[in-house]
Amino acid sequence: MSNAQPPADPSRRTVLTALSWSAPVLALSASAPTAVASAATTGGALTLNGGSSAGEGIFFAGSNYDGATASGPYTAQQLQVIVTVPTGVPFTTSAAPAGFDVSVDGNVVTLTNTTPLPAGEQTPVLGDFFISGSFAVGTSYTVRVAPTTITTTFTGLAADGTF
């Protein structure tokens, strides 16, 4: 067994040498921008066509995104359509529409774009997506769009609807 001595404190020369090598690196990293922030896309118009029916559910048909007034493209994962249905009612959804992903968390169904929505172009969205369930007459649902900078028009559906 050896009697190893604990390492001695570094010498002044070792500390100064290390500092002289690290100073330029620290200066360079301090002068670099911390992040290159891209401006968030704003504008565009989303028309949500569809309807709702007690005992059946909510459906979308012929919905459209118009990027004519958008500041740029909405990249994947930037657009969400969030539908909240009454709690306690079992429901199912159709398969994810082309260009979108569907997730369900409790009574909230979220559709998120998986492909970019280009600026300056019309793009059909949501296909014939539906949420089916035996929702009682008089119960309510909500449909929200994120980001809120997209102008949203509802045709046959309502942002705050009643079955």
Task: Please tell me what each predicted stretch does.
Residues 1-10, 19, 23, 27-28:
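N-terminal secretory signal peptides
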Residues 9, 21, 75, 141-146:
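Ser/Thr/Pro/Gly-rich, low-complexity intrinsically disordered stalk/linker tracts of secreted
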Residues 53-77:
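Short beta-strand elements of extracellular/lumenal beta-sandwich folds
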Residues 63-66, 134-159:
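Serine/threonine-enriched low-complexity regions used as flexible
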Residues 69-75, 86-88, 134:
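Short solvent-exposed strand-capping/beta-turn motif centered on an Asx-Ser/Thr pair
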Residues 76-110, 115, 147-163:
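A surface/secretory-pathway sequence property marking extracellular, secreted
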Residues 114-141:
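Low-complexity, intrinsically disordered segments enriched in Ser/Thr together with acidic residues
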